[in-house]
Amino acid sequence: MISPAMLLAAENPVLVYFQRVFMPDPFQGIYQVNTFDLLILAPYFLVLVVLAFYGSHRYLLLYKFYRNRASRPLPPVEALNPLPRVTVQLPVYNERYVVERLIEEACGIDYPRELLEIQVLDDSTDDTVALARNCVERFARLGHPIRYLHRDNREGYKAGALAEGLQSATGEFIAIFDADFLPPTDFLEKTMPHFSDPGVGMVQTRWSYINRGYSVLTQVQAILLDGHFVFEHGARSRSGCFFNFNGTAGIWRRQAIEDAGGWQHDTLTEDTDLSYRAQLCGWKFLYLPDVECLSELPVEMNAFKTQQARWAKGLIQTGRKLLPAIWRSPVPWRIKLEAFFHLTANLCYPLMSVLAALILPAIIVRFYQGWFQMLYIDLPLMIAATGSVSTFYLGSQRELFPGDWRNKLRFLPFILATGIGLTITNTCAVLEGLFGHQSEFVRTPKYRIEDRVAGSRTRFFQNVYRRRTHWVALVEILIGSYFTFAVYHALGNENYATGMFLCLFVIGYLGTGLYSLFQARWDRLAGLVAGQIAALRRPFSKSLQES
C-alpha cells in the first residue's frame, strides 16, 4: 500500500511540465549569486519597495476621495451679514507681459467697492514698474479701490511682499492671486459665504488653464495639476486631513494668518508652510472643486523644470521645519500620516535617480537568475511603484471631463516620461532642501500665452524672460543615451517587456534634455520665420486697407 507521504514525495508530472515550460533556468549550474550581484540587488529592491510604498499611497488617496465623495462643501445656509471688508493682494515681480491683464481682471471682481481694497505688491526691477503704476492709476481714476506698493528690495521674496502688504491692508479677509492668474468676476461671491463658519481659516479654489492646449508640455502639466487638485486636495479635504493653500486663487481669514505667525520666508513654499501652521492652530480649510480660476501654464521646458524644482525643495524644507511639530501635535494619527506622505513625497526623486543608476545592471543580473523571478517579484513592485500614476492622473481626467477623458489617454506615455525626466533637477532640489541649502526664490516667467490667440507664439519667441539652459540638460541627455543602450541590451536578449518599460526612461531623459537644450534655438528660428512671414504680409495688408 502507498502511503500519503510517498505520494507527496513523488514527482508531480504537471508541476514538472509547468517548471520546464514556464520556469526555465538555462543557467542552472553555471550562474551563482556573488557579492557584486548582492551589492546591486539589495539597494535595487530596497528602492523599489520604498517607491512601491509611496506609489500605493495614491491608491489610498483614491480610496479616501471616493469613500468621502458625499462630503463635498455645501453652500452655506446663511450668508455673511454684514459683508466684511476684503483685501485682494497681487504680488508681482518683473511681469511685463501679464501685469496689466492681472490688474484688469482683479478690478472686475464683483464686490461693493467701499468694502474692497486691491493691493498691487510690486518688487519689479524692469519696465513692469511703469506698466503697473500706470495701469493702477488708470483704474484708480475710474473709481476702483486699488493701490500700488513698490519695494526697492526683495527681502523675503513673495512671502516678504505679502507680509509687508498685510501691514497696511484694511481687509478682514485676504484674497491672493499670482501674476499668471485671471481672477473670476464672481470669485468673492462664491467663496466668502463659506466664512460664515467662524472656524474656517482659508478657502482654496481649483486652477484651470487658459493655455492648456498650447503644446504637449502644457497638456501634460495640466493633467499633473488636475491630479493634484482633484484627488490630493479632494481626498485630504473631504477626509478631514491637512491640505495646503496653493499660493494663489484662494482667500484667507486674516486672523488665521496672524494666529499662525504670519508669512515666513525660510522655505520656498511659504504657502504650504503657513497652511500647516494655521491648521495646527485649529483652523479649518475648505477646498471648492467647482470654483475655477484660470491661470497660465509655463510653455518653456526650463521654466517648467525650475518651477517643479522650487516646489520639490520647498516641500522638503517645510517637512524638515514642521514634521516634528506635527508628530508632537494632538491631531489624529491618520492626519499625521497623511501630512508625512504629503511633505516627503518628493523623496521619490532621489530614489528614482538611484533606480536609474541600478536598473541596467540589475536587469542583467536578474536575467541570468531566470526571467520568471522578474515576473513574480520585480514586475509587481514596478507596477506598485508606477502603475498608480496612470490610475491617478487618468482618473482625474475622468472626473473633470467625463465625456472626453479617453482623448487624454494619448498623453499617458508623456506623463510617465515627464515624471522620469524631472528626476535629475528635482533630486538636486530635494538634496538641497534636506541639507539646508538656502537659495533664491526663482519665479516662473509668464508670457501671456493663450490658446488660439493671435500673437501668443510671436510674443513667446520675442520675450525677454527666457530661462537659460542649465548644465542638467546635458546630464539628462547622457543618461538618456545610457538608457538607449539599456533598451538595446534588453531587446537583444529578447526581454521585450523590460525593453518597452525602459523606453519611458529614454523618452523622459532624452526628451527633457534635448527640449531644454534646443527649445531656445528652435523657437528663435520659428520666431525669425514668423517675423519674415509678417513682413511679407504687411505690404498686402496695407494695399487692402488703402483699397
Question: What do the predicted segments below correspond to?
Answer:
Residues 84-87, 117, 258, 273:
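Cell-envelope/extracellular polymer assembly enzymes that use nucleotide-activated donors
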Residues 97-98, 328-351, 449-484:
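Loop-to-transmembrane boundary segments
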Residues 104-150, 154:
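Acidic donor-binding segment of Leloir-type glycosyltransferases
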